[in-house]
């Protein structure tokens, strides 16, 4: 029996697809692929040059044109004979020179040699190929032997390189690092050790943690250890892959992102002012200077700091602390009104609430001066300062608080003007009640590009009521103090 490769290939019509069939008919004609094997796996355009395309020649990889089979009409027997003779010649050339990697039938030769060597006979090899076929006429699946897996695994990195090339022109040099980076994410994330605590804390500071910005220092200071323990795994995950990821991203991509983010410069400055206002609001709400406990130590300090009412200023530590805190708050709000974010309606609303807190502090400071505890404290100071009556103490405290209200009046006047400007850019509630939703949406989003006020969340009636309450609160406090001075 003749087991020569060329003879068997020529008898089967130049293809291995018809060899296992008992009919021997050329039902599914076969031919070489127009695209080489490397370009076909990479899903890229091939120049179709033979014996080696330009892409494979540039990369230095073997260029192989494998046999393909496509269902269709039967070919003309004369053309099939010509195709068979051409396949036989090319196959014989590949057998005579097995080291020629540019041969067209090199891949087919390896499969046939593996089939004959593993089976030991033609019939066994045909049976092995027959098991991979179906009776429905579907294309044959080529079997992969054990030694073929190593070759495919070795060439996998070369086939994946064109898929990564569009990301960056310099990314192909780092392809092995990119392929090996998957091992870093396969293992479970372990808690960070003590050596990485400094890096983790730096990463947490660079992140946008809203809770750390909104809460005051004394509130989130006690929970710093708990927050660090909860955020440690995520920080460790990002720090482990940050160096490799940043090295793989092109500089042009990063520069474009930075340029696009620079368009939000005005929005970020407005956000910074709003964050400062929220911080002031949290501190004003958390620390109440007007209701500090009346301890013996504070009582002695108050007695030592008091002065005689007649012809001298009288300031207790309670009033002094209240005045200093309110002055700092008013100064901070005044600086915000001079900034570029002075037309932000959210900032104006937050500043209005802070002004209400400041007025409440002055009211409580004036009320504490005539409370029972403070009166007892002043009674203890009588041996030192002489006969001090309660009316004199009330009058002195009321005059001090009344003298500080001009600072609040200036701030309220400026804040009221800003609220009036925001109301002019906001639709009226009465007119909007008769309009449709589409009309309202069009009116909200047709503001000029230069307008920095975001009035989509507050109506004109809300801003007007806020302005009215600010002026009314200041007038009520002044009126109460003046009426108390008239009664004394």
UniProtKB/Swiss-Prot annotation:
CDD domains noted in UniProt: GAL4
Extent of Polar residues compositional bias: 9-25
Main location: nucleus
Sorted UniProt keywords: DNA-binding, Metal-binding, Nucleus, Transcription, Transcription regulation
Localization in the cell: Nucleus
SMART domains linked: GAL4
Region (Disordered): 1-29
Up-regulation conditions: Expression correlates with the formation of the sclerotia and thus the pigment production.
GO molecular function, one term: DNA-binding transcription factor activity, RNA polymerase II-specific
GO BP terms, alphabetized: aflatoxin biosynthetic process
One GO term describing the cellular component: nucleus
DNA-binding stretch(es), residue numbering of this chain: 36-63
PANTHER family (UniProt xref): MONODICTYPHENONE CLUSTER TRANSCRIPTION FACTOR-RELATED (PTHR31069:SF31), OLEATE-ACTIVATED TRANSCRIPTION FACTOR 1-RELATED (PTHR31069)
Role played: Transcription factor; part of the gene cluster responsible for the typical purple-black color of the ergot sclerotia. The ergochrome gene cluster produces several ergot pigments including the yellow ergochrome secalonic acid and its derivatives, as well as the red anthraquinones endocrocin and clavorubin.
Name used for this protein in its record: Ergochrome gene cluster transcriptional regulator CPUR_05433
Natural source organism: Claviceps purpurea (strain 20.1)
């Amino acid at each position: 029996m003749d087991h020569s490769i060329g003879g068997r290939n020529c008898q089967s019509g130049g293809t291995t697809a018809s060899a296992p069939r008992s009919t021997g008919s050329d039902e599914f004609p076969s031919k070489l692929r127009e695209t080489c094997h490397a370009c076909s796996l990479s899903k890229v355009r091939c120049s179709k040059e033979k014996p080696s395309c330009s892409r494979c020649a540039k990369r230095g990889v073997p260029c192989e044109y494998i046999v393909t089979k496509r269902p269709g009409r039967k070919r003309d027997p004369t053309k099939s004979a010509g195709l068979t003779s051409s396949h036989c010649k090319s196959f014989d050339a590949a057998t005579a020179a097995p080291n020629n990697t540019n041969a067209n039938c090199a891949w087919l030769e390896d499969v046939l040699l593996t089939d004959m060597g593993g089976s030991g006979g033609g019939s066994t090899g045909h049976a092995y190929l027959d098991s991979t076929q179906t009776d429905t006429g579907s294309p044959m699946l080529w079997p992969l032997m054990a030694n073929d897996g190593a070759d495919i695994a070795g060439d996998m990195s070369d086939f994946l390189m064109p898929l990564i090339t569009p990301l960056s022109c310099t990314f192909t040099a780092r392809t092995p690092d990119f392929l090996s980076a998957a091992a870093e994410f396969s293992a479970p994330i372990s808690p960070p050790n003590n050596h990485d605590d400094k890096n983790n804390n730096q990463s947490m500071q660079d992140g946008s943690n809203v809770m750390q910005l909104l809460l005051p220092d004394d509130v989130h200071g006690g929970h710093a250890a708990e927050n660090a323990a909860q955020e440690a795994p995520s920080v460790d995950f990002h720090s482990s892959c940050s160096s490799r990821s940043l090295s793989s991203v092109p500089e042009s991509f990063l520069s474009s992102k930075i340029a696009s983010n620079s368009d939000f410069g005005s929005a970020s400055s407005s956000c910074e002012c709003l964050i400062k206002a929220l911080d002031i609001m949290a501190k004003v709400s958390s620390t109440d200077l007007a209701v500090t406990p009346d301890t013996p130590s504070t009582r002695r300090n108050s007695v030592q700091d008091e002065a005689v009412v007649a012809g001298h200023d009288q300031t207790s530590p309670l009033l002094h602390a209240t005045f200093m805190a309110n002055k700092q708050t008013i100064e901070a709000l005044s600086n915000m009104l001079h900034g570029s974010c002075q037309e932000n309606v959210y900032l104006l609303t937050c500043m209005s609430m802070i002004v209400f807190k400041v007025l409440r502090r002055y009211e409580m400071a004036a009320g504490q001066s005539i409370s029972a505890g403070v009166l007892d404290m002043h009674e203890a100071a009588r041996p030192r300062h002489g006969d001090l009556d309660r009316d004199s103490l009330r009058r002195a405290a009321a005059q001090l608080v009344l003298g500080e209200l001009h600072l609040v009046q200036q701030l309220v006047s400026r804040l009221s003007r800003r609220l009036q400007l925001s109301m002019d850019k906001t639709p009226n509630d009465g007119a909007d009640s008769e309009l449709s939703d589409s009309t309202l949406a069009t009116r909200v989003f047709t503001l000029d590009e230069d307008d920095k006020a975001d009035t989509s969340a507050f109506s004109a009636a809300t801003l007007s009521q806020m302005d009215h309450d600010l002026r009314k609160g200041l007038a009520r406090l002044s009126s109460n103090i003046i009426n108390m001075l008239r009664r004394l």
